[in-house]
Amino acid sequence: MSSLTPLLLRSLTGPARRLMVPRAQVHSKPPREQLGVLDITIGLTSCFVCCLLPAGWVLSHLESYKKRE
């Protein structure tokens, strides 16, 4: 059985290797206005508060979730 596995996998992936996948030609323009330091700071802080703060709170209170009351 184990000697047939590579042959089976090769026969399944063989046709997929020959497919040509077209690549998109994506071009963008330069930004209309440059972001300042304050804008970047506000954006990174809001991402931190929205994503990492709740996860950190849950991880810090993990022991209280494990207790059965």
Curated annotation (Swiss-Prot):
Q: How is it modified after translation?
A: In response to mitochondrial stress, the precursor protein is ubiquitinated by the SIFI complex in the cytoplasm before mitochondrial import, leading to its degradation. Within the SIFI complex, UBR4 initiates ubiquitin chain that are further elongated or branched by KCMF1.
A single GO cellular-component term on record: mitochondrion
Stretch forming the transit peptide: 1-25
**Annotated compartments:** Mitochondrion inner membrane
Any transmembrane segments, and where? 37-60
Give residue ranges on the Mitochondrial intermembrane side.
Answer: 61-69
Mitochondrial matrix domain ranges by topology: 26-36
Entry's Gene Ontology BP terms: mitochondrial electron transport, cytochrome c to oxygen
Where in this protein would one find the motif SIFI-degron, according to its record? Answer: 2-19
Q: What role does it play? A: Component of the cytochrome c oxidase, the last enzyme in the mitochondrial electron transport chain which drives oxidative phosphorylation. The respiratory chain contains 3 multisubunit complexes succinate dehydrogenase (complex II, CII), ubiquinol-cytochrome c oxidoreductase (cytochrome b-c1 complex, complex III, CIII) and cytochrome c oxidase (complex IV, CIV), that cooperate to transfer electrons derived from NADH and succinate to molecular oxygen, creating an electrochemical gradient over the inner membrane that drives transmembrane transport and the ATP synthase.
Assembly state and interactors?
A: Component of the cytochrome c oxidase (complex IV, CIV), a multisubunit enzyme composed of 14 subunits. The complex is composed of a catalytic core of 3 subunits MT-CO1, MT-CO2 and MT-CO3, encoded in the mitochondrial DNA, and 11 supernumerary subunits COX4I, COX5A, COX5B, COX6A, COX6B, COX6C, COX7A, COX7B, COX7C, COX8 and NDUFA4, which are encoded in the nuclear genome.
Question: What protein am I looking at?
Answer: Cytochrome c oxidase subunit 8A, mitochondrial
Instruction: Give me the gene this protein comes from.
Output: Cox8a
